């Protein structure tokens, strides 16, 4: 019955003209969100050099942290309301079902490296804030300022625009007109839809990466500096297992990118892997995840990448006026170099 249901969905998507971008190849396989080619290349060469799936994810994400991919990964981007850049990252071992993650990491540039140390040197899953920084220092990471002229200028400009946009509601003074500090307004007004400015696809460009090793071992990971002008302490989907990324050797791996506050509520990466476990092609699994979120948040910004343990892969995204196509990178034995793929949003 499940197979019949999957076939029916596939036929429906084709009839409606919904695009399917899918592929397959002999293992190994690297897939990551956005056209971050250097990250893909680093992960791929790690595999060719004998590294593990975890090594590939860590090295790939670390490249984006160093290169400050699109200003939304690594230091010097997405300042919070106080002007500080903080980092979120996670890495997951789909063989042992083990995870290491950091949220709101301060003053440490290599967030994915710290997440790997959480996985390898603790029995915890997630460390946050100043305590995560202390842990990182104990592991040999350097404490240094994550702000740059670019992030300071972004923050100054935001203040000059009366702190617009921001993420407050039901407070005084009116957050749509004034900066804080804020306090509760005394009454709650239920929003019909979440506060959204015109979507800037460069405000949520988490790198999410999935790797299928030639042995079939899987790994997944993410790294991001979050959203611009977030309320200090905010953590999105990226460092949360099942939300930002997920991997399981018995099915596959997936990662998400976009509006983390919305994505976090649906565990899209876990859901995609479970769809693949049930027999769905990765492209179909990704689309089913997007369609599921659409029911509640039709205007959400997000995309998902999926890869099965047999080397098949796919992606899907939610269509908006300013976001109609999603680019992602693939590296496998069929290509001499990382290849950019595009999928039309649904």
UniProtKB/Swiss-Prot annotation:
Q: Report keywords, A-Z.
A: Autocatalytic cleavage, Disulfide bond, Glycoprotein, Hydrolase, Lysosome, Protease, Signal
Reported modifications of this chain: Cleaved into an alpha and beta chain by autocatalysis; this activates the enzyme. The N-terminal residue of the beta subunit is responsible for the nucleophile hydrolase activity.
GO BP terms in the entry: proteolysis
| GO terms for cellular component | endoplasmic reticulum; extracellular space; lysosome
- What residues form the catalytic site here? 206 (nucleophile)
**Entry's Gene Ontology molecular function annotations:** N4-(beta-N-acetylglucosaminyl)-L-asparaginase activity; peptidase activity
Q: Which reaction does it catalyse?
A: N(4)-(beta-N-acetyl-D-glucosaminyl)-L-asparagine + H2O = N-acetyl-beta-D-glucosaminylamine + L-aspartate + H(+)
InterPro entries assigned: Ntn_hydrolases_N, Peptidase_T2
In the Enzyme Commission scheme, what number(s) does this protein have? 3.5.1.26
What S-S linkages are listed for this chain? Answer: 64-69, 163-179, 286-306, 317-345
Domain of life, per the record?
A: Eukaryota
**Locations listed in the record:** Lysosome
Q: Does the keyword Cytoplasm apply?
A: no
The signal peptide annotation in the UniProt record is 1-23
Q: Which residues bind substrate?
A: 234-237, 257-260
TM stretches of this protein = none
Family assignment from sequence similarity: Belongs to the Ntn-hydrolase family.
Record's function text: Cleaves the GlcNAc-Asn bond which joins oligosaccharides to the peptide of asparagine-linked glycoproteins.
Spell out the subunit comment.
Heterotetramer of two alpha and two beta chains arranged as a dimer of alpha/beta heterodimers.
The protein's matches in PANTHER family, at most eight in alphabetical order, are given as: L-ASPARAGINASE, N(4)-(BETA-N-ACETYLGLUCOSAMINYL)-L-ASPARAGINASE
Q: What is this protein called?
A: N(4)-(beta-N-acetylglucosaminyl)-L-asparaginase
